[in-house]
Amino acid sequence: TGGASEIELNYGNQISHHFKSQVKNLVNQTSLKELTALIYKADFVICPDSGPAHIATAMKTKVIGLYAMSNPMRSGPYLSKNWVINHYPKAAKKLLNKEISELKWGYRIKKSEAMNLITPEEVIAKIDLLVLESY
């Protein structure tokens, strides 16, 4: 899911091209109501600190949360804390030269390169663990 911006559309296309099986790219193709229904039916959702993470938590759908720009202890999916990939402390140190204890509570790291600290391998490892635990 995502909006109509060029960057979101490009990300959706890039992600969907990496799969060997057929993937339906729904970037800019769902309403909020449709997105909520999709999340409700999903086994789990992978997303950053965003609306879908909060919708999934409300629907009791597991969330693999991708956090580097915000602190998941403040805004993370409280029902899926064990599935969060948390690089907020690493991003604070690398990009701001600060410990998270030095940052104001709720501070967002507004540098897009923070999310690059999360590797595909980490996400795949979380998916594998979640699937093993759930099935």
Q: Language-model segments: which ranges?
A:
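Glycine-rich phosphate-binding loop signature in dinucleotide/nucleotide-binding domains
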Residues: K41, L130, S134
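Nucleotide-sugar donor-binding patch of glycosyltransferase catalytic domains
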Residues: H18, N25-L26, T57-V131
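Donor-binding and catalytic core of enzymes assembling or modifying cell-surface/extracellular glycoconjugates
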Residues: T1-P72
